Amino acid sequence: MGGTFDPIHYGHLVAASEVADLFGLDQVVFVPSGQPWQKDRHVSAAEDRYLMTVIATASNPRFSVSRVDIDRAGPTYTRDTLRDLHALNPDSELFFITGADALASILSWQGWETLFELAHFVGVSRPGYELRREHITGVLGELPDDALTLVEIPALAISSTDCRQRAAHRRPLWYLMPDGVVQYVSKRRLYRAEPGPAVAVTETSLSTGDHP
C-alpha cells in the first residue's frame, strides 16, 4: 500500500484490511513515500512518517512496513517502488493499493505505461471522490479485467488533511488513528501551526507508550 501516510490513520488501516480480505492477500506492505514528487505542500520528515506507520501496523501480523522508498535517493516514483518490491519478492504477485483520486492522475506518473505490467492496481475511494471507472481508464484504452479494481471504503471519511488540521489547532486526534500514533504526533509536535522546539527521535522517546 503506497502513500505519504502524513499521518497514517484508521482509514488507511481499514482500507488495507478490507482489500487484503477481498483479494485473499497474504500480507499488506505499507510503503511510505520518500520524497513525494507530486505534493505541493510541506511533507513531514520521512523517518517520522515511517515510525508512525510502524506504530500503527505493529499489532496486525498481516501488515508490514517497507523502507524501499525512504531509503532510495531522489523523488519517489511508483514505478521504482514496484520494481524494488519485485526484486525483494520475485515470486510474489503484487497488488498496488492507493487512493482512487491518485489513480485519476495516473497519466502524469513517471513511466505509467509500465505500471500495469508490474502490479494489479486497487483504487480505494477517499472522501468526496465520485468513484467512476471511466475517470481513470477513459484515456488508457482497454485494460484486462483484473488490471484495475475500484473499492469503496466508508472508513476513508477520515483524511490525513483533517488530521493535520486538527493537530495544528490542538484538537483531539483520538479515535481517528491508533493511540500510539496520537502520542507520537504529540511528542514530536507534528503539524503544529507554530513550530515548537525540536525533539530528537530516539529509542528513549518512543519507550513511553508511543511504540508497541
Swiss-Prot record:
CDD domains, per the entry: NMNAT
Pathway: Cofactor biosynthesis; NAD(+) biosynthesis; deamido-NAD(+) from nicotinate D-ribonucleotide: step 1/1
Catalysed conversion reaction: nicotinate beta-D-ribonucleotide + ATP + H(+) = deamido-NAD(+) + diphosphate
InterPro entries, per the entry: Cyt_trans-like, NadD/NMNAT, Rossmann-like_a/b/a_fold
E.C. number: 2.7.7.18
Family that this chain belongs to: Belongs to the NadD family.
Function in brief: Catalyzes the reversible adenylation of nicotinate mononucleotide (NaMN) to nicotinic acid adenine dinucleotide (NaAD).
Name of this protein: Probable nicotinate-nucleotide adenylyltransferase
Gene: nadD
